Amino acid sequence: MTTIIAFIFVFGLIVFFHELGHFLFAKRAGIMVKDFSIGFGPKIFAYRKKETQYTIRLLPIGGYVRMAGEDGEEIELKPGYRVGLELTPEETVSKIIVNGKDQYVNAQPIEVSLCDLEKELFIEGYEDYDDTKKVRYQVERNALVIDGKIETMITPYDRSFNAKSLGNRAMTIFAGPLFNFILAILIFTALAFVQGGVPSTDNTLGNIMPDGAAAQAGLEKGDEVLSINGKETKSWTDIVQSVSENPGKTLDFKIDRDGKTQDIDVKPATQKENGKEVGKIGVETPMDTSFTAKITNGFTQTWNWIVQIFTILGNMFTGGFSLDMLNGPVGIYTSTQQVVQYGFMTVLNWTAVLSINLGIVNLLPLPALDGGRLMFFLYELVRGKPIDPKKEGIIHFAGFALLMVLMILVTWNDIQRAFF
């Protein structure tokens, strides 16, 4: 049960931040957002506020933000349609009832002759279905079209995705992966504050373990190690290397303590790691507890992981591709099961790493991914006009189908690794 809760928390948080990026930048650009959904499948929770419906769905392995104009959805009332109109006191249309007119007793019956619900926002027709009573009404920008129990808000063209500038469209799509990186930065920064600091690379000693060789020799926390056996030490890595390479051998530590230099002999204990003997003196990594270090930790950790993940991706394509290099939901669940054993802080760290992974994967220039859409925007920038929407739709559909096939293969491979 703990693993299931952790899995839902991790995926839910990552997906929420990704979709939040799309949502906020769409709103900033003036794009109508019709749906903000976390998860796929049947609805667990639904709430509508103004023009947007917010939903949580059963499967927490994805989400979406549905923006006006993205899916080609448009409301068309052809000449001859008989509808009911609810009017405001100013005689503008607030509701267009297509089906279920009997439930709106005050609706004005009209037979449509001409209608524009995108640009000029008007409806013309014959009142009471009488061709001698021609009328024309302006339609409210937030008017609803009611078809039985389904209510759909009209989309003025200037509120649609495609009506916006190339820069606004590109930023709205890029904002999803961007917010995945922001989530990682926030988590790594929070962890630095909770843990009281970040590991330092300085050549100073951290906490001294009571029964270790360092404590027995008289070393203290905060001692600056100038050299070991005459070899200058400039960083914590230099100290670790010198100690590890000399198990059971007495080492001359030249240290600076409170401005005074002194020599202390330390004999590292011998321990086995991966079948090899190494030296240990019982000293923890020094911590940088400064405010600046805690704040910058989020950025440096995120950047280091980005570089590392891109390096792995490069090796995948240059060194030969294998399904074992990829993890689907089952593989991530299995990894989460292991991570949970080390506590909540480790789960948070795992969430940050996964969020960076999702951000990078979504930026890959593949159809159906955010990166694929950004490539089409680049094409539009170079060519001066967008690709034909039908062609783009076909390419995205083909890309989505290939991704689904790959996901099925990866998931099957995950199941075999986990259970067979």
Swiss-Prot record:
It comes from the Bacteria. GO terms for molecular function: metal ion binding; metalloendopeptidase activity. The keyword DNA damage does not apply. Its EC number is 3.4.24.-. Its cofactor is Zn(2+). Zn(2+) binds at H18, H22. InterPro entries: PDZ, PDZ_sf, Pept_M50_Zn, Peptidase_M50. GO terms for biological process: proteolysis. Keywords: Cell membrane, Hydrolase, Membrane, Metal-binding, Metalloprotease, Protease, Transmembrane, Transmembrane helix, Zinc. GO terms for cellular component: plasma membrane. It is a multi-pass membrane protein. It is found in: Cell membrane. It holds the Pfam family PDZ_2. Residues 176-260 form the PDZ domain. The active site is at E19. The keyword Hydrolase applies. The chain crosses the membrane at residues 172-194, 304-326, 347-369, 393-412. Belongs to the peptidase M50B family. This is Putative zinc metalloprotease Lin1355. It comes from Listeria innocua serovar 6a (strain ATCC BAA-680 / CLIP 11262).
